[in-house]
Amino acid sequence: AECIFLSQGRVINLQNLIKESEEIELHKPNTKRCIYVASRAIVNIDGVYNKVEDIIEESKGVNKVGSTKQGIGPAYAGEALRTALTMGQLFSLSNDQIDQKVSELCTVFPYLKKEEILQGLSSAKANIQALLQSGKIQIVSDDFLTTDVVKGKHILIEGAQSVGLGKFGGSYPNNTSSDCSLHGILSACLLPKADLCIGVANAVVSKVGGGRSNTKLED
């Protein structure tokens, strides 16, 4: 792959983004590969949305949905409530504006600690700023895949769980929090169509975490 694009439909864990950029450099030193991140991608840091998801999951007792506790669901909830911080906002808003966004987040999820979030954001932002300056990471417009940068190139999109665990086609509530069907993927990437769609299926259905499985044998 010449480049990696994280679309607006993604939740970006800042610590993981830094780590993965370092791993690319480790395995491919002096590479010209770059991680492009959509400005509308949602920001997550360790101890924020994953903490929220952990609290919610544990409160369910024996009725846990099988969450991976990465904070994806609460991050999308934050986006719907317009309290989430995007990658573009992280580098365009003033410190006072970011402070206000975090205050709004802590109003929705009162068990979060504002100062810890601000400290985590500041630390991760400084590290990512260095990667931006080196060209290892670029924050781009959400319609990046339709720009001249990728014109004439092949685009491979990872669909992950697809319909079986999707927000609309999955076995609610034991499903993921995004629409990972073909239509949802194209929408998140702002692409009008797919030229070729390849479906891959296992002989035995598997899933991450616990929860109901429609093909599970009990005997």
Regions found by a protein language model. Give the residues of each.
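Non-transmembrane, aqueous-exposed alpha-helical and coiled segments at domain scale
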Residues: 1-219
